[in-house]
């Protein structure tokens, strides 16, 4: 009798631990990350938000980017997938950089502003530009 009570209590304990673990994982799942240059979001630059995305996710994460000019060379690595980068407006949400082929002989292919290596990456309502001076070719 004592053995069956002990087994029953152990089963309940294990079920409780398992349910707590599942609940904690659901609480950690974040579907939207907010980027804002002025500090009103969770991140001040887009690269930080991309780096916060979990590797090889099976659900979609939206990185919402508030209006602003984001001067950064953005790289979305191969292990990042199922991500939407959504700007507040195409006219006022701008990702920009100013590399050109003649800087340290980097060549044209390294002058990107955004490099996407991951799969299922979507961009909406934002502008991506290379605003390099007319000193050399740029992507």
Give short role names for the model-derived ranges.
Residues 1-28:
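Bacterial Sec-dependent N-terminal signal peptides
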Residues 27-29, 55-58, 78, 116:
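Flexible, charged surface loops at secondary-structure boundaries
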Residues 44-55, 70-79, 85:
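Short, T/G/N/S-enriched strand-turn elements that build extracellular solenoid repeat scaffolds
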Residues 30-64:
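Acidic Gly/Asp/Thr-rich repetitive segments characteristic of extracellular carbohydrate-active
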Residues 37-42, 62, 81-138:
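Right-handed parallel beta-helix/beta-spiral solenoid domain characteristic of secreted/periplasmic
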Residues 68-72, 90-92:
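Short active-site-proximal "capping" loops at secondary-structure junctions
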């Amino acid at each position: 009798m004592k053995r069956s009570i002990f087994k029953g209590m152990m089963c309940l304990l294990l079920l409780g631990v398992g349910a707590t673990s599942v609940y904690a994982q659901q609480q950690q799942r974040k579907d939207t990350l907010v980027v804002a240059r002025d500090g009103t979001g969770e991140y001040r630059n887009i690269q930080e938000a991309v780096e916060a995305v979990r590797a090889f996710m099976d659900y979609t994460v939206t990185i919402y980017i508030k209006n602003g000019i984001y001067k950064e060379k953005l790289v979305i690595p191969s292990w990042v997938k199922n991500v939407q980068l959504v700007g507040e407006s195409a006219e006022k949400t701008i990702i920009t950089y100013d590399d050109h082929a003649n800087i340290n002989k980097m060549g044209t292919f390294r002058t990107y502003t955004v490099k996407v290596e991951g799969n299922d990456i979507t961009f909406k309502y934002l502008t991506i530009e290379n605003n390099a001076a007319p000193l050399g070719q740029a992507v």
